[in-house]
């Protein structure tokens, strides 16, 4: 989904936000898929460029488990038009994946939805303190879980997590390391 670029309102500086038509389109598409699936939301992921304002809320929450690198505040829009709330209400989106901030590759759970960054993959830009790598996502059809990690150019797997298990604070110390049973 297109998260646009810069604010079109002269008195609101910074980055753009999803417009209401986009939020409504998502709501109608989600409802249609849920209805076709017998009233049960289909597990889904969302991909867009600019992070939602909730990325900063989640990253600042001391009770949240943040996995990965956060070297800068999310450059999110100043206005919030409710896309995250729409996803939460619909119950289909398990995680959102964004880019935009070259010095972030973290993932953090916020109200049951994983908010994650990809990894800087472009060329030489204004700033890039992380090396070019990639976020990999492995989903299973019709199951509300996925595994994600950063894969380095050298083939190393970094920050491998399983949604939602890796982000449960209540018993995370009792769980085996990722990849072990």
Q: What do the predicted segments below correspond to?
A:
Residues 11-105, 175-176:
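His/acidic metal-ligating clusters that form di-metal
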Residues 1, 46, 51, 135, ...:
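Structured catalytic/translocation cores of nucleotide/phosphate-coupled proteins
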Residues 3, 97-100, 150-153:
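Acidic carboxylate-rich catalytic motifs and surrounding loops in phosphoryl-/glycosyl-chemistry enzymes
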Residues 4-6, 51-53, 120-123, 142:
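Short, solvent-exposed loop/turn segments at secondary-structure junctions
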Residues 1-8, 47, 114-120:
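Active-site-proximal beta-strand elements of phosphoester/diester hydrolases
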Residues 83-90, 104-181:
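Binuclear metal-dependent phosphoesterase catalytic core
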């Amino acid at each position: 989904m297109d998260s646009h670029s810069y604010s079109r309102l002269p008195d609101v500086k910074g980055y753009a936000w999803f417009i209401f038509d986009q939020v409504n389109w998502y709501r109608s598409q989600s409802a249609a898929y849920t209805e076709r699936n017998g009233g049960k939301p289909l597990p889904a992921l969302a991909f867009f460029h600019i992070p939602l304002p909730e990325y900063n809320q989640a990253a600042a929450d001391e009770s949240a488990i943040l996995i990965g690198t956060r070297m800068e505040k999310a450059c999110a829009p100043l206005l919030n038009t409710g896309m995250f709330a729409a996803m939460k209400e619909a119950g289909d989106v398990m995680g959102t994946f964004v880019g935009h901030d070259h010095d972030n590759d973290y993932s953090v759970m916020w109200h049951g939805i994983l908010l994650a960054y990809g990894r800087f993959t472009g060329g030489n830009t204004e700033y890039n303190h992380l090396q070019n790598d990639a976020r990999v996502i492995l989903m299973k059809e019709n199951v509300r879980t996925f595994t994600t990690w950063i894969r380095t150019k050298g083939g190393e797997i970094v920050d491998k997590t399983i949604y939602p298990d890796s982000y449960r604070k209540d018993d995370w110390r009792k769980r085996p390391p990722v990849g072990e049973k």
